[in-house]
Regions:
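Structural microenvironment flanking redox-active thiols in thiol-disulfide oxidoreductases
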Residues: 13-62, 72-81
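Aromatic-flanked redox-active Cys/Sec active sites in thiol-based oxidoreductases
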Residues: 4-11, 41
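Non-globular targeting/processing and membrane-anchoring segments
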Residues: 118-137
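Alpha/beta-hydrolase fold active-site loops
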Residues: 1-2, 34, 92
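Conserved Rossmann-like nucleotide-binding pocket used by diverse enzymes
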Residues: 7, 37, 68, 84
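Thiol/disulfide oxidoreductase modules built on the thioredoxin-like
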Residues: 17, 61-63, 70-121
């Protein structure tokens, strides 16, 4: 399964909750079948959120999982392409995709630990059961 935390480093909720939570998931689920890919999605203040500033942020906040840089909106639009495709309302947004590629959860704002843990546990259990079913007795 995939955890996709979408954020931008000038977003207070992303810095105080989204990024630390994603780093925590990376630590806690290090042995689980999970891929974590951050998405740096910029829909405002483009002039100060370039690649150099992002690199400094990732180093300063010890982000170890890969972070993709969102493509700008098409035809001069301000909403980035992935943000538009997933109908994200802003940042932070967390997207959970299951082992077969289905969107299972999308949360805008603070994804509290209890609900995130429950949802991640369900996906880990499903993935474990799927592997066991394929391998057989």
């Amino acid at each position: 399964w995939v955890l996709l935390p979408a954020s931008q480093f000038l977003c207070r909720g992303c810095v105080s909750n989204g990024s630390p939570r994603a780093r925590g998931v990376a630590r806690q689920f290090a042995d689980a079948p999970v891929t974590i890919v951050g998405l740096h999605t910029v829909f405002e203040h483009h002039d100060v959120m370039g690649p150099e500033a992002l690199a400094v942020f990732l180093q300063e906040y010890r982000v170890t999982f890969p972070v993709a840089v969102e493509r700008p909106g098409r035809s001069g639009g301000t909403t980035p392409q992935t943000m538009r495709a997933y109908r994200m309302r802003g940042t932070p947004t967390v997207v959970l995709i299951d082992a077969v590629g289905r969107l299972r959860q999308q949360v805008f704002g603070i994804y509290d630990d209890l609900h995130l843990g429950r949802d991640l546990g369900s996906l880990v259990a499903e993935a474990t059961l799927s592997v066991a079913a394929v391998q057989g007795p």
